[in-house]
């Protein structure tokens, strides 16, 4: 948002008011006309409240074109203007509990509600409470029950004709239900996009290499205001009705809650998260309950709305210039706010991911004080053009990690510095690498890096790797936090006395883990490679590497070209392997693991050709429980004999090995006439004898 003048101080009310009007009008134009909002809601609200207060303190400063005297933005070009039969007003906002109590008191006083000697209202006001959706307000006009026109709010008096686009919203009925419909009905409501639909839309945008939307509100607004309704038809928009403009040919319902019930009977979509309450206490209780479930709702809301329920009381209360006196929007703490970005550091995740983190001047947003926010990755920093020293928009929603949405370029200082991604890990000093076609840069010091220690140990110990039974996440947490284990090699130095002292670790558990560690020393090359936790190297690739090279040293010393010769190893996997073994820290840990008395496995020469036995090239399916072999052991034996172990039975299956409680796979094999073997038959086949 470009500035045309320096920001005047509060001591100059005339200049300050003019500046505030200019800032707000520019923000309105960007939001309503350009569809490019560039000022957070919280900042807009703050500037608006300041202008309101200035005009209250200095009535002579009020101008006819002040944003406080109007509802929204002007109609944009490209759509036919529509003059609303009844103005589409916005609502005054409340933020603190005190604002709600004051609102209730104003309403009660205006309605001359009775009070007791202590001044407490004995006849509390009845309110209808609803959600405040984060979308785009529209009006729907029905004549004799048939939908004829839709218009945006615009400036409250004149909006834009979006009839053809609204026709594509499937939740909006083109004809009202029931035999008795009004001659004219002007329905007020909100067009929005559900969270799941927003996620799917952005997936489609990415797949088509088109611009993604920042949030569901922007997506809904942009979709509704498409000049081509065919595009709108492809966008998953929804609608909720919540108000009324004009009603002819029928009496108006006596209460707002009755109006919404009537809408439902007409087939209009009405949100069910609503209630009728009494007094300020009821309002605040509704607000708290909605706040607790806010993040689990399938759509975005930014507050709740309170309306005096009785229609006759609404009429008595009337309106001010831009809003009804009988209603108030109670907004949640702002999810976006402005602050200064003072530095950008990098954080190393459990898997080695390097994430830029913004260090911020403290700002209260989303109900908490935020000093740090994620910048996701280097590409995001570049795309958003975020620099050190910028004034930035920070967003925090619920329990979601705060993020920097963007920078206000018009406020950028001359000395703002660009972010430079480090080349070495700030934790362990290992090289930082970024694979082709990946957004995330990573530390290559996997086994050595303290930031990755817990993840590396957990992966090393899992069943398909070294299979260290009893070494769970809670034990790993203690071992790392007490600095007893730095790398996987340190696991094999643990003694009974050390383990027995761990929290909630009995002597029997300690001995079981010692026994499990001793057993884990005898493994296979494939399991060991998989246990190293090399990025993109799964169980199958580890087996292919072990088969191809026969021993570990040739794998560690292999060039990318040599790695590419391995079955199913492509450029990304080869690059990942090469980077891992090129890091000296990783080689050191591997040598420690291979030291005398540590991990061993049978090594052999590289396989010059595929196995030539009766199982070579055959497809085998395992099902049920075998008497003496685990499924993993049977799978390893079959693969060593050149067979492929599949997960489902088909016409291409050569054998099915069935144990106890074999299920549908056995039935399918019998149906297709595929040979079925038990464990003895499997052993015969492995020995080269046809069972």
Curated annotation (Swiss-Prot):
Record's protein name: DNA ligase
Role of this protein: DNA ligase that catalyzes the formation of phosphodiester linkages between 5'-phosphoryl and 3'-hydroxyl groups in double-stranded DNA using NAD as a coenzyme and as the energy source for the reaction. It is essential for DNA replication and repair of damaged DNA.
Name of encoding gene: ligA
UniProt cross-references to PANTHER family, sorted A to Z: CHROMOSOME TRANSMISSION FIDELITY FACTOR 18 (PTHR23389), DNA LIGASE (PTHR23389:SF9)
Cofactor entry: Mg(2+); Mn(2+)
Assigned keywords, A-Z: DNA damage, DNA repair, DNA replication, Ligase, Magnesium, Manganese, Metal-binding, NAD, Zinc
Catalytic activity: NAD(+) + (deoxyribonucleotide)n-3'-hydroxyl + 5'-phospho-(deoxyribonucleotide)m = (deoxyribonucleotide)n+m + AMP + beta-nicotinamide D-nucleotide
HAMAP family xref list: DNA_ligase_A
Domain of life of the organism encoding this protein: Bacteria
Record-annotated BRCT domain positions: 610-691
Pfam families per UniProt: BRCT (PF00533), DNA_ligase_aden (PF01653), DNA_ligase_OB (PF03120), DNA_ligase_ZBD (PF03119), HHH_2 (PF12826), HHH_5 (PF14520), Nlig-Ia (PF22745)
Active site: 132 (n6-amp-lysine intermediate)
Binding site for NAD(+): 41-45, 90-91, 130, 153, 190, 307, 331
CDD domains: BRCT_DNA_ligase_like, LIGANc
Source organism (scientific name): Burkholderia orbicola (strain MC0-3)
Gene Ontology biological process terms from the UniProt entry: DNA repair; DNA replication
EC number(s) reported in the record: 6.5.1.2
Enzyme class: ligase
Recorded family membership: Belongs to the NAD-dependent DNA ligase family. LigA subfamily.
Residues the entry annotates as binding Zn(2+): 425, 428, 443, 449
One cellular component (GO) term of this entry: cytosol
Gene Ontology MF terms: DNA binding; DNA ligase (NAD+) activity; metal ion binding
């Amino acid at each position: 948002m470009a500035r045309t003048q320096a920001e005047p101080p509060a001591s100059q009310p005339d200049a300050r008011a003019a500046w505030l009007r200019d800032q707000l009008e520019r923000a309105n134009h960007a939001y309503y006309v350009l569809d490019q909002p560039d000022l957070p809601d919280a900042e807009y609200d703050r500037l608006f409240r300041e202008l309101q207060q200035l005009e209250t303190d200095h009535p002579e400063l009020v101008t006819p074109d002040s944003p406080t005297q109007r509802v929204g933005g002007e109609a944009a070009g490209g759509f036919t203007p529509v003059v609303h039969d009844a103005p589409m007003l916005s609502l005054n906002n409340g933020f603190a509990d005190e604002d709600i109590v004051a609102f209730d008191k104003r309403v009660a006083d205006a309605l001359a509600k009775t009070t007791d000697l202590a001044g407490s209202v004995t006849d509390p006001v009845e309110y209808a409470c609803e959600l405040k959706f984060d979308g785009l307000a529209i009006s729907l006009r029905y004549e004799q029950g048939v939908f004829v026109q839709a218009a945006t709010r615009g400036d409250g008096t004149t909006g834009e004709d979006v009839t053809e686009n609204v026709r594509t919203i499937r939740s909006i009925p083109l004809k009202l239900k029931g035999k008795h419909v009004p001659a004219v009905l002007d329905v007020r409501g909100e067009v929005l996009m559900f969270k799941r639909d927003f996620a799917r839309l952005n997936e489609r945008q990415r797949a088509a290499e088109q611009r993604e939307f920042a949030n569901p509100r922007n997506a809904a607004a942009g979709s509704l205001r498409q000049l081509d309704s065919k595009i709108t038809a492809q966008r998953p928009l929804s609608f909720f009705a919540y108000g009324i403009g004009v009603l002819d040919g029928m009496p108006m319902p006596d209460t707002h809650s009755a109006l919404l019930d009537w809408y439902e009977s007409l087939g209009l979509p009405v949100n069910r998260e609503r209630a009728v309450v009494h007094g300020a206490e009821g309002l605040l209780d509704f607000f708290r309950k909605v706040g607790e479930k806010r993040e689990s709702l399938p759509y975005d809301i930014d507050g709740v709305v309170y309306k005096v329920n009785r229609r006759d009381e609404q009429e008595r209360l009337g309106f001010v210039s831009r809003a009804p006196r009988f209603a108030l929007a109670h907004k949640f703490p702002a999810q976006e706010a402005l602050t200064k970005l003072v530095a950008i550091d990098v954080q190393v995740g459990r898997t080695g991911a390097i994430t830029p983190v913004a260090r911020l001047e403290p700002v209260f947003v989303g109900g908490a004080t935020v000093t740090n926010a994620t910048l996701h990755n280097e590409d995001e920093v570049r795309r958003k053009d975020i620099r050190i020293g910028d004034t930035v928009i920070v967003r925090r929603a619920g329990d979601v990690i705060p993020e920097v949405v963007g920078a206000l370029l018009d406020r950028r200082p001359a000395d703002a510095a660009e972010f430079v991604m480090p080349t070495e890990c700030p934790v362990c000093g290992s090289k930082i690498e970024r694979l082709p076609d990946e957004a995330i840069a990573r530390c290559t010091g996997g086994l050595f890096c303290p930031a990755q220690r817990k993840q590396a140990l957990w992966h090393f110990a899992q069943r398909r790797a070294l299979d260290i039974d009893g070494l769970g996440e809670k034990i790993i947490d203690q071992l790392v936090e007490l600095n007893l284990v730095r790398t996987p090699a340190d696991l094999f130095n643990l003694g009974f006395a050390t383990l027995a002292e761990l929290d909630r670790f009995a002597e029997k558990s300690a001995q079981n883990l010692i026994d499990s560690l001793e057993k884990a020393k005898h493994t296979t090359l494939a399991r060991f490679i998989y246990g190293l936790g090399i990025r993109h190297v799964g169980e199958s690739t580890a087996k292919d590497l072990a088969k191809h090279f026969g021993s570990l040293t040739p794998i560690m010393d292999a060039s990318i070209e040599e790695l590419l010769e391995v079955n199913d190893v492509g450029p990304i996997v080869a690059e990942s392997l090469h980077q891992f073994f090129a890091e000296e820290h990783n080689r050191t840990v591997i040598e420690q693991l291979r030291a005398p008395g540590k991990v061993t496995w049978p090594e052999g020469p590289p396989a010059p050709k595929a196995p030539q036995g009766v199982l070579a090239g055959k497809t085998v399916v395992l099902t049920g429980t075998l008497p003496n072999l685990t499924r993993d052991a049977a799978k390893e034996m079959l693969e060593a004999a050149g067979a492929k172990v599949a997960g489902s039975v088909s016409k291409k299956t050569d054998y099915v090995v069935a144990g106890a409680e074999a299920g549908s796979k056995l039935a399918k094999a019998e149906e297709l006439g595929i040979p079925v073997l038990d464990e003895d038959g499997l052993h015969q086949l492995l020995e080269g004898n046809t069972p």
